[in-house]
């Protein structure tokens, strides 16, 4: 059978930062309307805004039975650390697949039993979706990990896959290679991934509407969504590691250091903007369907670093996100940045042409 780490409970009032208010919706949810509605995953919701569960906020990690028992507590401790740093807004479920198909199937069954018991999703319908071939189904994370191992490539993925209609942040992940000793990768990479995914929860948590189109618009362009998650994950992990607040993980065969990681991103930016995406500008990378959307991660991370350098004294948590739903993304961004989006794009374009030492100079030290 699958294993689940113990539930860790924290009071929400102790952790909310900067007067944060809203909770997030899911990209899985259809446009919200008052009354009962059907969501893309087959479940139903009865409100047009996210409903925060009463009581304390729980953080739960569920791991497939073929994973080492240490994996769940490490991820849970990391999520709790991220929650202390950025705020814990509403319940978190983090589901982690291994490599074994049977163990993966058992984890899907556990997930669907949980949904059915809570009255959120019929067990049979849940199994049809999550054990099937749909994109982002739970079992797809097991399959991707197994395929990566068979091919000798340490590919991995994780995602925040909902669920606003249930009032929780739900994540799924392929096997964390560094935490499990495969390919001799540093466990810090997996820690960073957890931070990256949790920042997506933070982003969603300031949006109350369940209207899917409105949520997508309020989240902002790809470079901001993914760049923000990547940069905040990098600095969040580095800061808490320096303070001794993160669990110990396998070192792997090479060090995972903040400045080095940001340097690698500069190589990716320089290559990307001189290759197939030559002539593109940062603010043109708005959609995941864009062939250049992968640049949104590296260029976006540096854009957020540049933004925070230009707005010294401000933070996204205190000064941007609390105004987001009222103002809309672009107005909130321009008010935060103190300049128009076009002016920001021009400034970033000039900044990114600087030498590597000049670019690295804006980064914090840990």
Residue map of PLM features:
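Acidic/His/Gly-enriched intrinsically disordered linker/tail segments
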Residues: 214-298, 310, 320-366
